[in-house]
């Protein structure tokens, strides 16, 4: 996720030989993302800083694009909430509803430091509430699409262990 934010080049990536491609992060509504500049290169550290902020065309546009371009391989769809959403949990459910029939898996993105308070979903009670809602919606949709949860790369080992336990308890 992050390279093909709007599902515009996933088949070209498959033709290059990738075994799977993940598009997104896709939010329910189109969103510009953070103000530019939002990508910074640190030459001496050989690193990049990304402050994109889930810029994307929105679920409907991306879904229409995927439906009109038959995928040539395993396609994951990374979903997240709109920056100004009043109900972020519901935004994830909107993403699941939109993409469960066209995705080979759906990634629930709770990792972005660029979306205020998104990392609150790393907390035990909030993560459990999110997963319970996702699994209930998946059951209501009679969907078998696998769920992946993208967590932050800079959390400590205790948080990783706690999140891992919750994911395993929920069979994710």
Each model region followed by its residue ranges:
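Flavin-dependent oxidoreductase catalytic cores
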Residues: 1-172
């Amino acid at each position: 996720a992050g390279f093909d934010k709007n599902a515009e080049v996933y088949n070209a990536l498959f033709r290059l030989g990738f075994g799977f491609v993940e598009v997104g992060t896709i939010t329910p509504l189109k969103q510009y993302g953070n103000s530019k500049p939002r990508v910074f290169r640190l030459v001496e550290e050989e690193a990049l800083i990304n402050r994109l902020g889930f810029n994307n065309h929105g679920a409907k546009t991306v879904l229409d694009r995927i439906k009109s371009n038959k995928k040539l391989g395993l396609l994951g769809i990374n979903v997240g909430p709109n920056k100004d959403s009043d109900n972020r949990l519901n935004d994830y459910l909107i993403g699941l509803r939109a993409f469960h029939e066209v995705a080979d898996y759906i990634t629930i993105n709770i990792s972005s430091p660029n979306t205020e308070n998104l990392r609150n979903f790393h907390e035990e009670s909030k993560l459990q509430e999110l997963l319970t809602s996702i699994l209930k919606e998946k059951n209501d949709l009679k969907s078998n699409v696998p769920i992946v949860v993208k967590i932050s790369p800079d959390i400590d080992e205790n948080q990783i262990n706690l999140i891992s336990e919750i994911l395993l308890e929920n069979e994710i």
